[in-house]
């Protein structure tokens, strides 16, 4: 039986509110996956799910479990089963062990949206492959408006190590002097986004600036960049401009389906090194339309936001012939990768999941069980995970 204990606490308040670039080949062979298929047409409500647990019908329980389920006992049972923990009762309530090592996971669900599931499942994948006696407790709260009281709550419970997938709006909160004895690891932000931060905070976010710098080694002097108006896209385009002040920047709203006005007879794109700082779908659409409008880029450049096999599978070989994609991820333990796939997470590509489990591994091997071999090769440098950039084509 796994020694890691997972606890989920839902604190929902309704108050108002490093760098060495090299070009590698990316395999297009999709990894194996395991899915639980629901063959029952009827909806399974809370009573139905409890009945399935009572009867020991685990696979039916997993396949019929919906994302709208908020019952704490059922959520605990769901994550326990996926983590390989045996259940002995229908209530499926975890009993805390007398562990000297505890880690809190602080999730402002409305702020990070779908990333809350990614962070949760990435942590579960790691814990399912670990034999360390660690108690992990999830504090799921509304947004930044309730973070302060949530941190006070976990602090009162004796938690000294916190994984916090937050936005930059929460940085002033966790940087408060009253929390200086708590170690915070932030997988969603890079240290460059913080004006100042304390020694008790480590950032695990992707270094997009280094990725852009590495990609520019394959560029010519004519730089162009597309964005989609999102906050991350704006940041990436600003960094492109920092390296290439004369770069041509074009923003295409994600709702827009008209690319002709952006591509047709656009001399700024001809023989240019073009950054696609957009969503995956928009990037694939742009890359496939260059030839349609007789555009021949010198290179098509993508950062981590487009590092996904889906992009390569969507494009024909001719459309990706000049494409280079940057990634900061290193090798990952196969066991963790396999368990993450069961939970619907691809650790080799997900830009939040990989930094999350790196942080969990870092806390366990450097603080809780100092001397234990780390499962990742990256190091911490000045409060930031030092990733090595790889270029794939």
Language model segments and positions:
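Extracytosolic ligand-binding ectodomains
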Residues: 2-10, 18-393
């Amino acid at each position: 039986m796994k020694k890691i204990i997972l606890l989920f606490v839902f604190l929902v308040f309704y108050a108002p509110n490093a760098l060495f670039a090299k070009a590698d080949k990316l395999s297009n062979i999709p990894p194996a996956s395991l899915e639980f298929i629901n063959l029952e047409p009827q909806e399974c409500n809370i009573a139905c799910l409890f009945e399935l647990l009572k009867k020991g019908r685990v696979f039916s329980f997993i396949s019929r479990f919906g994302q709208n389920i908020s019952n704490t006992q059922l959520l605990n049972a769901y994550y326990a089963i996926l983590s390989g923990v045996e259940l002995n009762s229908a209530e499926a309530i975890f009993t805390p062990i007398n562990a000297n090592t505890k880690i809190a996971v602080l999730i402002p669900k409305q702020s990070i949206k779908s990333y809350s599931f990614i962070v949760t499942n990435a942590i579960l994948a790691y814990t399912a492959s670990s034999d360390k006696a660690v108690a992990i407790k999830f504090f799921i709260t509304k947004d930044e408006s309730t973070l302060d009281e949530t941190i006070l709550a976990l602090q009162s419970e004796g938690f000294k190590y916190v994984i916090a997938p937050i936005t930059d709006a929460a940085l002033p909160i966790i940087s408060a002097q009253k929390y200086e004895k708590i170690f915070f690891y932030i997988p969603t932000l890079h240290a460059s986004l913080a004006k100042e931060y304390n020694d008790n905070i480590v950032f695990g976010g992707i270094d997009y600036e280094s990725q852009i710098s590495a990609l520019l080694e394959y560029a010519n002097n004519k730089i162009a960049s597309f964005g989609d108006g999102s906050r991350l896209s704006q940041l990436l385009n600003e960094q492109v401009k920092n390296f290439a002040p004369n770069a041509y920047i074009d923003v295409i709203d994600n709702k827009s389906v008209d690319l002709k006005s952006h591509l047709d007879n656009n001399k700024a794109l001809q023989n240019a090194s073009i950054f696609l700082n957009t969503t995956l779908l928009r990037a694939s659409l742009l890359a496939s339309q260059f030839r349609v409008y007789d555009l021949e880029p010198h290179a098509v450049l993508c950062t981590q936001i487009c590092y996904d096999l889906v992009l390569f599978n969507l494009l024909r070989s001719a459309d990706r012939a000049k494409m280079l994609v940057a990634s900061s991820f290193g090798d990952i333990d196969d066991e963790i990768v396999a368990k993450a796939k069961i939970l619907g997470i691809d650790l080799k590509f997900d830009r939040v999941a990989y930094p999350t489990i790196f942080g969990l591994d870092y806390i366990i091997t450097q603080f809780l069980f100092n001397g234990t071999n780390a499962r990742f090769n990256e190091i911490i440098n000045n409060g930031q995970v030092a990733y090595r950039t790889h270029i794939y084509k």
